[in-house]
Amino acid sequence: IANNLYIQEVGTGKETQITNDGKQNQVINGSADWVYEEEFSMAKAFWWAPDSKKIAFLRFDESNVKEFTMTNYTGELYPDYETFKYPKVGANNALVTAHIYNTDSRKTVVADAGADKDIYYPRLTWTTDPNKVVITKLNRHQNHLELLSTDAATGNTTVLLEEKNKYYIDIDDNLTFLEDGKSFIWTSEM
């Protein structure tokens, strides 16, 4: 079960496994890695579509991230040690991809976010249209942001909005889609 994503039907208890490649300190599906928890205040990395027929999730490939051992002083005579993937400045981050699983077809598509793989997806937001999810894409320097409208059936993306700053772009949760599923309100410091 660790590092994989499952769906459980409340009424029947039936469980469906969405991913099967999760492995400790290798691949995480649907849960954030250390960087996303610290930098973007993200713990869970999955989001249901408004019609509950699709689930978008992030996949973190940590296989090229170096490990770090932390001492955990528990009050006992000897401390515990925890080793986990911990990228330091300039070192490899996890390779992150956005996926969309369809509960009817049981198929998963990968969002096409372009050629640059050294990026962040600090936010995913479904529009009111259950076939469109918007991915916030941010470069490694965190000074170039794109909102990508993503087709849930194909993974094809279109840039809705782009912001660049010489220094830094702060991430927030101020993206609201209106009832038509196309119009949105976005707050910005630019």
Model-identified regions with their sequence ranges:
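Beta-strand C-termini and the immediately following turn/loop, strongest in propeller blades
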Residues: 1-4, 9, 44-47, 56-62, ...
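Predominantly five- to eight-bladed beta-propeller fold
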Residues: 18-46, 54-110
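Beta-rich, blade/repeat-based domains predominating
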Residues: 98, 123-127, 174-176
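A conserved hydrophobic secondary-structure block that centers on an alpha-helix together
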Residues: 1-25, 116-122
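Short loop/turn segments that connect beta-strands within beta-propeller blades
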Residues: 10-13, 21, 102-106, 151-155
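Long hydrophobic segments that form regular secondary structure
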Residues: 102-139
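Short glycine-/Asp-/Thr-/Trp-enriched loop segments that recur within the blades
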Residues: 25-42, 116-121, 165-173
